[in-house]
């Protein structure tokens, strides 16, 4: 926005007291969260593994389910937390190329522009030792650019948003693992996000 910030959340059902759940078994507790904080979310984050067998239709179903309006009367942004399950060297070498081609072709074919752009947040917190793709900035950058180039070739980057999102603190806190080393470059990133 021109001023302020977008209020978003990843509101899973766990953490809510059973009486607060009001009988809900929904995995994404959007209504409960909004009731708790007294605001409507402008953005919702949902995770999906970046691996063969997963597809855009799964995410589009979730998006349609939680597609609502924020306090400004605009539709919520839907942020896809896309998590690789293989090391960055394998991604940089093209092991996910077929997956990305298939996934982005599906995005291009199913894109519903009335719902607004899709916000892709691939391989976030790459500077944190808890991810399988941390500790290799050179190959991370190659992998990101490779993925982005495929999306661009299929026309997905013209309308959708790619969010680069490191952790606020690098762990380990070495110079080699500094978040700046993982940055793919302005040509490959639309927005910056930080996990705190």
How should these model regions be labeled?
Residues 1-3, 35-40, 71-74, 112-114, ...:
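Flexible, charged surface loops at secondary-structure boundaries
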Residues 46-166:
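Substrate-binding cleft of extracellular glycoside hydrolase catalytic domains
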Residues 39-51, 179-196:
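Aromatic- and acid-rich polysaccharide-binding/catalytic face
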Residues 1-43, 152-155:
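N-terminal module-boundary/linker segments of secreted carbohydrate-active enzymes
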Residues 17-37, 55-65, 100-105, 173-184:
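Short, acidic/polar
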Residues 167-171:
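Short, catalytically relevant binding-site loops at active-site mouths
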């Amino acid at each position: 926005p021109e001023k302020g910030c977008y209020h978003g959340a990843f509101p899973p059902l766990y953490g809510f007291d059973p009486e607060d759940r009001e009988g809900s078994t929904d995995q994404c507790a959007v209504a409960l969260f909004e009731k708790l904080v007294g605001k409507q979310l402008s953005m919702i984050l949902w995770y999906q593994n970046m691996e063969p067998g997963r597809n855009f239709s799964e995410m589009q179903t979730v998006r349609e389910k939680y597609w609502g309006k924020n306090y400004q009367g605009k539709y919520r942004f839907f942020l896809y937390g896309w998590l690789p399950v293989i090391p960055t060297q394998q991604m940089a070498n093209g092991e996910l190329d077929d997956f990305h081609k298939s996934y982005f072709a599906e995005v291009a074919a199913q894109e519903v522009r009335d719902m607004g752009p899709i916000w892709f947040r691939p391989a976030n917190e790459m500077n944190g030792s808890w991810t399988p793709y941390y500790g290799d900035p050179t190959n991370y950058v190659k992998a990101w650019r490779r993925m982005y180039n495929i999306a661009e070739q299929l026309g997905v980057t013209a309308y959708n948003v790619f969010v680069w999102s490191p952790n606020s603190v690098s762990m380990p806190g070495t110079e080699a693992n500094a978040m700046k080393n993982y940055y793919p470059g302005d040509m490959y990133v639309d927005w910056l996000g930080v996990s705190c």
